[in-house]
Amino acid sequence: MRRTVKDFRNAKGQRLVYLTAYDYPTARLAEAAGVDAILVGDSLGMVVLGYPSTVPVTLEEMLHHTKAARRGAPETFLVADLPYLAYATLDRALLAAERLLKEGGADAVKLEGGEEVAEIVQGLVRAGVPVLGHVGLTPQTASQLGGYKLQGRRPEEAERILKGALALEEAGAYGVVLEMVPARLAKEVTERLSVHTVGIGAGPHTDAQVLVFHDVVGLYGDFKPRFVKRYLEAGRLIQEALSRYAQEVREGVFPGEEHSF
């Protein structure tokens, strides 16, 4: 049975599993594996669409992939990212969230930022939109943070991240993602918040963990961040299978009699 926002609000201290999925087959596999929540992240821009960052991702693209993921995982709690600038104002955020929830089938939306987006989060929550916050490394504005690197090493950075997480909780977010922050900071934030935290590159002390589907199964062999653990080398296995297929076609081995009518 699909979890509800209330379940996640009461999930503090539980070891929850989030996983990204961007289409029907990956969402179907994630649901079959029993994950607690699926995130249709705007990381699909880089992972699936080949963009250099998440910035080019449009609301229409998010909607397209959210619909597909929902069809693949009808019984799993589904969170969809609000893409870059879709929440520059509350009106824009409400319109984007409405489409992702009503048309896309999402159960909640995620947006990046701390204190600077707290009013937007509050407005969304007041309108009945469940919101997952996101602090630390925020990929949509990574260029302003010096690139894709660890955040919160310096005391002032750590203080900004903590204040941001607290502001999101106060605004009504049902949980907060902590990305690429030191484990000790993630532990402190997790202990200070009453809502659950979701870590990615944030150590073992968060309430939940999230990883990108393609990283978990090793679809891209040349990309392995330090915080990722690969459970399969799917990219290599798929490439080997495709090479064998091509070889057998060229050698006249496939199709054989058993593949013919």
UniProtKB/Swiss-Prot annotation:
CDD domains reported for this sequence: KPHMT-like (cd06557)
Domain of life: Bacteria
Keyword Magnesium assigned: yes
Pathway given in the UniProt record: Cofactor biosynthesis; (R)-pantothenate biosynthesis; (R)-pantoate from 3-methyl-2-oxobutanoate: step 1/2
GO terms, molecular function: 3-methyl-2-oxobutanoate hydroxymethyltransferase activity; magnesium ion binding
EC primary class: transferase
Localization annotation: Cytoplasm
Residues annotated as catalytic: 179
UniProt cross-references to PANTHER family, sorted A to Z: 3-METHYL-2-OXOBUTANOATE HYDROXYMETHYLTRANSFERASE
HAMAP family per record: PanB
Function: Catalyzes the reversible reaction in which hydroxymethyl group from 5,10-methylenetetrahydrofolate is transferred onto alpha-ketoisovalerate to form ketopantoate.
Family: Belongs to the PanB family.
Subunit structure, interactors included: Homodecamer; pentamer of dimers.
Protein name: 3-methyl-2-oxobutanoate hydroxymethyltransferase
Native source organism of the sequence: Thermus thermophilus (strain ATCC 27634 / DSM 579 / HB8)
Taxonomy of the source species: Bacteria, Thermotogati, Deinococcota, Deinococci, Thermales
